[in-house]
Structure formats: structure tokens, C-alpha cells
Amino acid sequence: MASLKELLPTPKAAASTFYDHSSDPWFKERYGGESAQSDAAAAAAKPSGPAKPVPPYGKRGGFVPRRPEDFGDGGAFPEIHVAQYPLGMGRRDEKGGSKILALTVDAKGSVAFDAVVKQGENASKIVYSKHSDLVPKIATADSEATADDEEYQKQIEETTERTKAALEKVVNVRLSAAQPKNVPTHDSESKFIKYKPSQQSAAFNSGAKERIIRMSEMAQDPLEPPKFKHKRVPRASGSPPVPVMHSPPRPVTVKDQQDWKIPPCISNWKNPKGYTIPLDKRLAADGRGLQEVQINDNFAKLSEALYVAEQKAREAVQMRSKVQRELQLKEKERKEQELRALAQKARMERTGAPPAPTGVPAGGGRGAVDDREEDMDLEQPREQRRESREEREARIERDRIREERRRERERERRLEARDAAMGKKSKLTRDRDRDVSEKIALGMASTGGAKGGEVMYDQRLFNQDKGMDSGFATDDQYNIYSKGLFTAQPTLSTLYRPKKDGDSDVYGDADEQLEKVMKTDRFKPDKGFSGASERSGKRDRPVEFDKQEENDPFGLDQFLTEVKKGKKAVEKIGSGGAMRASGGSSMRDDYEGGGSGRSRINFERGR
């Protein structure tokens, strides 16, 4: 080890094991310096004794600070678990009523002697205790400027130098960071550190008691990308807020308390506290009367425009559908005439009739076909005017039955009017006071329901063969409803009419109620619009939907028409098309025309 110490350079700073703070300037100034130390050495018999140096960190096991000198120029020691009072902070005074004030200094470091007059009730007041407070402000400023001019200028220069140095440092760092070619120079001198390892046995560190390490700074690559992301530092707080000058406090009166009282919220849905709120307060809180409701005229214009547009669209759709139907009818007539002309031509060729004139084109021409159609139309009324004896007798019988039924209906209306005037229930009006459910159960709401005479009780309400107990319907009936609902027009007129004798004194007569309801235009605009009229009439019964029935699904009407016309085999010529060369093996031999399996052949007029 001796040879190694000789080789190593002399250390710059030797680390001491303890620090003696008694020779510091602050200790001499605070506790009297050398004279205080000599007095303390002379009075060694006193319990306080001289100031002891503070042991270094890690070796303060038996050190217990009791006096202010033991703390040095710092605070308490956290590793020593005893009650510590550095500079007397936190220590309770022995005398509770002590009037000794703590020594305070001002911003310049001078002792503030006016603290004596600024205690107690004067603590919150402004006390003028200086001579400068009595001198006018202008004279004070002039005297202070002349007296402190040199000192103030010196402070300005020092502050300027420090600010300049700080700004140059920041600017140089920014410039060096922006210019990577300027590699910052580092102190390449190595440092030697001697220390004692914690493990002092011969098995570790080759039995050495001390170790010396060499510490040097690691070289940095100037082209290496940055390892850390720069984050924005939040801006520091500026000047303190401006003090707000308040008026002197005053006691709160009862009126102020009432003015500050906020009433509870009035809700139309919730009332958790169970308050009883009058209706006038509730309406006032609603705010309905605060503003006047004004309806914009554009709403009426918009509804009128929509109504007119809808009517025009409906008219356009109807016109288009009408034109389309006319075009389809014309096209159908044209094709029928062409087929009829072709059939006539084929029939002429088959029978050997003379051919058509050369001036007429193939197919007979449109003019010839029209002439023949007119002749056939003229012959049909002549045949219809011929009436046989049996037909004439049947017609006379039908007229007689129709006249008898008309007289019977007039008689029933006269009887019903007479019974209504006498207050007697007629056959048609005796069931009007029944409930709707009873009418439905009795089958009175349908046209096919049986209607018997008036009895004490109606047997149709009991022992019905249709219901949930009897399977709800017959076995061969697939519909869940056995009969139509609301299909009788007389019954519908009574279902929607109020009862005759019910509450007539309160609501008026039934006819008056019905008339009032019928005249009520609830869903119509208040103002009429020009060019827009109600196309549909008033509805006096519910909406009914009829099942769409196919027209002649089995072709019976067409079959009967062909039988009545009495077609012959010769008339089939030309109806099967121009190509009929099958030898009986076609699948459509049973149909009219036979021949090819094609469903239709479109013929075009020759050009």
C-alpha cells in the first residue's frame, strides 16, 4: 500500500471525520466569538459547558442535542429520536404571561424596534412609528435619493451583472444545442477516490482494508440522437393578485337574510321534500304568462304549399295512370285487330275465297277491319232488341217484385216514424240501447245475424256452440274469426251514436251531440286555402279491408263464353300461329290451337 500511495497524486481535499462549527463566523457572531468561548472554558463547572462539535452523519448514536449551540446553523436531526428545539422553536414558555417579544428585523436587516407598539390591538392597524412618516412624501423622496444614491447604484450594477451572466449562460446553452458541431468540452482529468469497504474480512477484497478507485467521465458521441424528450415547463406564477379593499363589516339584518333566502325549486315531476305548492306559484314558476305565443305565418304557408303540392301530385299520378291505361288499351286493340286480320286471311286461303284486293295491304288493312267491326257492332243491338215471350214475362215479374219491395220499405219507414213520435220502440229501434259487446255477441253487428222478437232474456247469449270450450270454431274453418265485425250499416249508425235517454239534461239531445261531433273540424286547417278542396267524403263507419279475389281463377267464365259462342273447328285456323307442323306429339294438343309448345307468337306488320 505504501508504494501505491507514493505513486498516486496528492488529493486536493481531505475528508474529515467530523466538523467543528465553533470556528464559523455565524457561531462567533451569535454566541460571542472567542470571548464567549474563553468565558465558557473558564466556567467549565456549569452544566452547559462549552460548545461541542456536531458529529458527522452516521456517528451520532450518543449525541443528544439540548442547547441551541448543538444544532449548529441548521435544524433538528431526524435520526436522533429525542425532543429537539432548534433555536427554541416549539418549546413551551415556562411563564405563560410573558411579555418578551421576539427579535425581528426588516427587509434591510435592521432591527424592527417598532414591534413593541404594533402588538395587541394595534396589530391590525397602521402605526406611524418612524420619523420618515412625519416628513412630507416629496421631501422624503428627495432626501432618500440623495442619501442612498451610491448604495442604490451599486445594487443596480450588481444585479445587472448577475442577470447578464445568467442570460449569457442560457443563450450559450441554446446555441450549443442548436449547433452540434460545437462539442462541449469536458474535464478529462480523472478523480481518485479512496474508501473503506464494508466487508473487512480476509475473504473479501484480498484482505485489503482500503480501496482506491479511479473515476473519469465517459466519452459521449456527438452524433448520438437525444435520449430524453423535452417537455414544456409550466409557466411560473406571476405577480401576486391585487388586494381587494373591502368595506368594514356590518351585522346582517333580518331583511338581508330574507333577501338572500332562495325558495325551493318547483318541479312538475318531482317533489322529494313534500312541499305543498299553491297553483298560482306553480303557474308563475312555469313561466307561461311571461311571454306571448306568436305563431309564424310561415307554418300556414308551408302547410298550404304541402297540401297544394300533394293535390297536384295526386292529379299528375291519376293523369299518368289514365294515359297509361289508354295506351295499353290501344295497344291491345291494335294487336287484336292484327291477329283478327291474320285469322281472316288464313280462313280465306283455307276456304278458297277470292283474295283481297291488291290495293289493300296484307292482313286486310286497318280500314277494312274497322268497317267489319262497325257492321258487327250494328248487328248486335238488332239481336238484343229481339225479345222472346219467356224473357218478357220474366222481366214483367221482376218489375212487379221490385215495386212490392219498394212499397214495403215505405210502409216500414212510416211505422218507424210513428213509433218514434209516440215514444215506442219499433222493431228496428228496440235494440239500439244494447251494449256494443252484447251486439257483437248476439251477431247483430253483421248482416247475416238472426234477429228475433223481444223476449225477457235472449237465449243467444247462452249455450253457444262456438267458443273456447267448444274449440273456438269448427274443424273445417281455418280463419280465427267466424264472421265479419261491423258489417251492418244500420248497426254501425247506432254504435257511434250516443244513447237517446242518457245524460240528455247534461250534454243535450243525442241528435245535437252527433251533429256537434260531425261538424267539428278538428284535424282541418283553420283557414281555407285556394285551390285545395276535400276530395274524400266524411266517414260514418270504420275502415274495412276486403280480401282481394282473383278474377276467374279457374277460367270458367272464358269456358262458358266459348261454349255460348259455339265455336267450330274451322274457327281455330290461324289462332295457333303460322307454324303448325306437329304430328300430334305436342304437349299442348288439348288446348285451343294445338301445334307448337310456344305460348305466344308476335306478328309484325310487313313493311
From Swiss-Prot:
Biased composition regions of type Basic and acidic residues, renumbered to the chain: 327-339, 379-434, 516-527, 535-550, 562-571
Tissue specificity field: Widely expressed.
Coiled coil start-end: 313-349, 391-418
Principal location class: nucleus
Ranges annotated as biased composition (Low complexity): 35-49
Domain of life, per lineage: Eukaryota
Induction (free text): Induced by drought, cold and salt stresses. Induced by wounding and treatment with abscisic acid (ABA), jasmonate (JA), salicylic acid (SA) and ethylene.
Pfam families tied to this protein: SKIP_SNW
Note in the entry: Plants silencing SKIPA exhibit growth arrest and reduced cell viability. Plants overexpressing SKIPA exhibit drought resistance and significantly improved growth performance in medium containing stress agents (abscisic acid, salt, or mannitol).
Subunit: Interacts with FLO6/SIP4. Interacts with DIS1.
Family: Belongs to the SNW family.
Designated name of the protein: SNW/SKI-interacting protein A
UniProt organism field: Oryza sativa subsp. japonica
UniProt lineage: Eukaryota, Viridiplantae, Streptophyta, Embryophyta, Tracheophyta
